[in-house]
Amino acid sequence: MTSILSSSEQAESLISELTIISAALMVLWLYLPGFLANTFAMMWGKWLPKTGYGPWPIDGGRNWKDGNRILGDGKTWNGLIGGSITSGIMMVLIVLQMGEPTALSETKATIFIHPLTGYEGSWWDTGSQISSAFILGTILGFSCLLGDSAGSFVKRRRGLKREGDVSSKAPLLDTLPFAIMVFAFGILFLG
C-alpha cells in the first residue's frame, strides 16, 4: 500500500536525510535571488542615476525625531524596485535552467532542489512556472531590501550611519536583518 505524504511530511523526510552542509547549500540555493537583491539594488541605485533617472531616496530626505535621516541616501526607490525585479528575473532564470519541478521525494539525489517544488495550489501560484517564479523571486528580493532598510533605520538611530562608501561599524546590522526577512518571507512562500 502506498502512502501519500503531505508536502510538509515530504519536506521533513528530505531534511532528515540531509547533512548540515548539504542543507545549508540547499537553503542558499533556494534563497539565492533574495540574498543577491542587495547587490542588484546597489547596481540599480548607482547606474540608473547616470542615465538621468534619480536617485530618489526612499525617505525623501526627511529626518526622524532624533534629527538623523530616516534611511539615508543609500536606500533609493531605484534600488528597491530594480533590486526586487532583478531578483525576480534571476529566479525565472534558475527555474528555466532547472526545467520541470520534481516531487520532493525525487530530490534526494541533489541539493539543488527546484524552487517551485510543491508550489501548485499556493496562494501565489499563477498557473505558470515563469510568472510564479518571477513573483517568488521578486518577493524574496523585496523582503531582503525591506530587512536591509530596517537595519539601516536601526543603525541611524544608534548613530552608526555610513560615511561615503565606507559601511558602518555594525556588521551584524548590515547582514542579519536582510537575512532574517528573506527567511521569514521564504517560510511564507516555501513552507
Model segments located where?
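Hydrophobic alpha-helical transmembrane segments
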Residues: M1-G191
